[in-house]
Amino acid sequence: VTAAQDLVPLPEDPLTEVAAAVLGDGHHVVLDLLDVVRHHDGPPVDVVRAGDDLLPRLAHENALDQALLMARQVLRAGGLFVAAVPELDKLGRLRPTAPPPKVTGRGAERQVTVQLWDWAADGESYALEVVRLVRGAETWEVANTVATRHRVLSPEQISASLTDAGFGTVQRLSPAECGHPLPVWVAVAPA
């Protein structure tokens, strides 16, 4: 979902599914947090979603508070902000270098995604490199790589940031509750 005028819920997207479960049946206008700036003068939307590592990346760039304020402003009364956020605050002192690889597809369509973490000395932030491998004719090939920096956010920090942005009810859903591998935060725009 990338443009306000052609917003269609993605049925395989757990964040959109969480929003639909809360809002009920019907068509819901869903906007990605990265598209909020372009949509700022558009009509209110039902849902603003933020994918897995977006909030920690925005926090590292000192842009999280402004992004959440803008998300709140584009939502209709009762609209939802839904975000998947890794909870790595307890891992900072352990400084793991990578989670297990993610494997998708079968046979010639198989892909492997690997994350590499390089922690700051204080454990409060980390560099993240994501490498996606695909099957070539005879060997694995690097399809693409992405490198970013993230700040570690505790559940308390996430809750406070959402509340400070003007959201009413703020709730954290565990992976078992929401079907996403990461905890998902749901915040309601007040009436």
What are these regions (language model features)?
Residues 6-29:
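Conserved alpha-helix/loop element of class I SAM-dependent methyltransferases that forms part
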Residues 24, 59, 76:
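Short conserved AdoMet
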Residues 24, 28-47:
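Class I SAM-dependent methyltransferase SAM/SAH-binding core
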Residues 46-63:
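A short SAM/SAH-binding and catalytic strip from SAM-dependent methyltransferases
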Residues 63-77:
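A short glycine-rich, Lys/Arg-flanked "PGG" loop and its adjoining helix->strand segment in the class I
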Residues 78-85:
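Conserved beta-strand signature within the Rossmann-like core of class I S-adenosyl-L-methionine
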Residues 85-155:
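SAM-dependent methyltransferase
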Residues 149-191:
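C-terminal lobe and adjacent flexible extensions of AdoMet/dcAdoMet transferase-like proteins
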